[in-house]
Amino acid sequence: MRSKTFTTHRYGAAWTLALVMAWATPGARAAHDTDTIPQSVQAAMARANLPLQSLSVLVQPAGSGPAILSVAPKRAMNPASIAKLVTTSAGLDLLGPTYVWHTDFLTDGVIRNGHLRGNLYVRGGGDPKLVLERIEAIYAQLQAQGIRAIDGDMVLDNSAFALPKHEAGGFDGEALRPYNVQPDALLVNFKAVILRFVPQPHAGYATVEVEPAMAGLRVPKRVRLQGGRCGDWHQALRADFSNPRHYRLRGAYPRACGEQEWPVAYADPQAHAKRALLGLWQASGGQLRGTVRWGHVPAHATSLLRAPSLPLGEVIQDINKFSNNVMAQQLFLTLSPQQPATFDGAQQTLAAWWRRTLPEQPLPKVINGSGLTRQGQLSAAALAALLQHNLRAPYAETFRQSLAIAGIDGTVKRVGHQRGEAALLGQAWLKTGTLRDVASVAGYVRNTQGQWLVVVGIINHEPARGGRAALMQLLAWAAQQPTPQARPH
């Protein structure tokens, strides 16, 4: 998967300074009870058939001052993906924004006349974003060392993580959705295959491009075009991705859709890295005489190349802006003190960090670091306290830039363009969460006075469909509220 290009909006130290000034700026006390749910939010929840009792909210000034809105803020709720804010905050605090993971390439042989006379070992270190173009660059470096052909095997080692057995699709039955991919110490391209459809109108078909090149996977090179609206083009293709050796497209692609991409979790997760790394090696012009297999790096192996990941400060942009589940879980496992890393170890590290950082707040229940669970627990008050803490942290700006900007990017790119949301456009830095029984949002909102607010809203109800619209109304309402004057001490 080609890595995304992020549009960054850098206010630098000026943003933090503005927050500090906002904390000290008195404002008029809001003319409403702090526990009264705004009418616009109530109306949106009514339209979605959501009971008001399913809502937990805390809206407060950044830094200090009385709450503007407080509705059951201490109730333990399933946060869904806003739990990623806990994971990324702990990662920044414990590892630092410049932290990198490493993928090691080693051998038990020698290089002679363009041949690696031995095995090539690839040892994963948990890199959350070992994607197509980075692997291509690594292979170019190996070839620059004189390796054109590997006479032995390509041996893959992912022993840095010890993970429980995972049933693909066990969470919600959607085994081929990339958000359900399990973490892996040697995670290649998010264990996904990307199909790109490019219409050729004069020829009457769309070409089908595949990334990454997957050894042993057959994919149709083209699919016929059809007229009409774009609509549900996924359904129109009548795709079958269940066979990890052969993808089938029995339908047609709507001409009106233009170019589109379809990311699919590979049906045989254990074989994904093997097929992808071999396919990319062959696509680079490299040869392999042996096979690709899982194994362990022997003690006597010598290093050929150590490939660093992107720094953590950049990685968390994917995690928070785009809510990448498997990347969040990779980071979470990195917090585990023991080797191989485990979820239990990561949970213990996170708990100890939380007790040091926010001792007055109840410990959240973070299962896997991503929020993709039915068992997670976190209160709006506790998350608001974390967001307040992060404003004073050395990594405040890095954390803020990892959040999606309303109307600009990430999961809230469309926010601010709907009726009643104009005040949010470019004025809210947010993380959202969605499960069938959860809708959630958390982050920073700048009100019409130019002052910053911390906002957390969580809805737990099955189904929670329509909850996001209610939470957007909450954010829009918050943006219109004056900051209450801090109480005298």
Question: Where on the chain are the PLM-derived regions?
Answer:
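Short, Gly/Ser/Thr-enriched beta-strand-loop segments that form substrate-interacting elements
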Residues: P220-F241, T302-P308, Q418-N447
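Small-residue-rich helix-loop
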Residues: I68-V71, F332-H489
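A small/polar active-site loop signature that marks catalytic segments
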Residues: G227-T398
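Active-site SXXK
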Residues: G65, P79-P97, M154, L186, ...
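Short, well-structured active-site flanking segments
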Residues: D93-D108, R289-V292, A396-F399
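Bacterial N-terminal signal peptides
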Residues: G12-W23
